[in-house]
């Protein structure tokens, strides 16, 4: 299914446990809990631009082509190299400390991040 669209944060599961597992300080976890994230995805075949805007004006944007190594950036600004894949209609990426899958289900963008035995799920609703 096509990913292109603008999505607004709707719900999440296991936020605190996942962020603690990543090693984030309590004050950063608390501040992040109040973010209203807007995700914008532009897909042109195998080419993607994936941007997330956070409360306070911070924006993280990654450009990648399915199956090709690229340089990406974490929310904290750390740059790393990864090869993003498409598996069963899901965009799959390995970040430095966790594994993430993203898929469109109806009008929702479902992002699942896993570190060890902790899984974080963020659901966003398509608004455009």
From Swiss-Prot:
GO cellular component, as recorded: cytosol; membrane; nucleus
Tissue: Predominantly expressed in ileum; also expressed in ovary.
Keyword annotations from UniProtKB, A to Z: Acetylation, Cytoplasm, Lipid transport, Lipid-binding, Membrane, Transport
Main localization (coarse): cytoplasm
InterPro entries for this protein: Calycin, Fatty_acid-bd, ILBP
Sites bearing N-acetylalanine, chain numbering: 2
Keyword Acetylation: yes
Membrane topology, as annotated: Peripheral membrane protein
Pfam family, one: Lipocalin_7
Gene3D superfamilies for this protein: 2.40.128.20
GO MF term list: fatty acid binding
Domain of life: Eukaryota
GO BP field: fatty acid transport; steroid metabolic process
Compartments it resides in: Cytoplasm; Membrane
Function noted in UniProt: Binds to bile acids and is involved in enterohepatic bile acid metabolism. Required for efficient apical to basolateral transport of conjugated bile acids in ileal enterocytes. Stimulates gastric acid and pepsinogen secretion.
Family recorded in the similarity comment: Belongs to the calycin superfamily. Fatty-acid binding protein (FABP) family.
Written domain comment of the UniProt record: Forms a beta-barrel structure that accommodates hydrophobic ligands in its interior. Can bind at least two ligands per molecule, however, the stoichiometry is debated.
Official protein name in the record: Gastrotropin
